[in-house]
Amino acid sequence: MFAAGDLVVYGGEGVCRVESIGPSGLAYDGGDKVYYHLSPLYRGGTVMTPVDTAVLMRPIISRDCALKLIAALPALPEQKPAERGMRAAKDFYHQLVLRCDCAELAAMIHGICRKRAWALRHGKKVSQMDERYLKRAEDQLYGELAAAL
């Protein structure tokens, strides 16, 4: 269980600070469930999630892990879908983003950037889906690295 003040990675929200732990305070909630009250670091708003949620929630990486990851970036293999096709790529990228693993996100960014560079050299464009998942992966990875460092 996390404590108030902890920095956590919560699903698609990215890095959040645990503001408090307690009942939701909403009228339709019976008050029998305990919630984390989270504040995303890089956007406004508040997120309430049950303590026993199935959504991925983990502490941010340590400063040492962040520095090791940055040092290992040139050697990371690119992450790309095993199968061809838009649907396979979308499912592959979606699963990587949901896992919130920094090394996998960095490898995914590397793969999409290489794909973009190849497309530019050949007068083509990268798909909107690739651009959308690249943005999500960059936001998650860079946000967590910034919070850790």
Show where each model-derived region lies.
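Conserved hydrophobic positions within beta-strands
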Residues: 16-18
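Charge/polar-rich, low-complexity and marginally structured segments
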Residues: 52-149
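Loop/turn positions that initiate beta-strands
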Residues: 5-6
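A generic structural signal for short beta-strands and their flanking turns/coil linkers
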Residues: 14, 32-34, 43-45
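Short, solvent-exposed secondary-structure boundary/capping segments
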Residues: 24-35
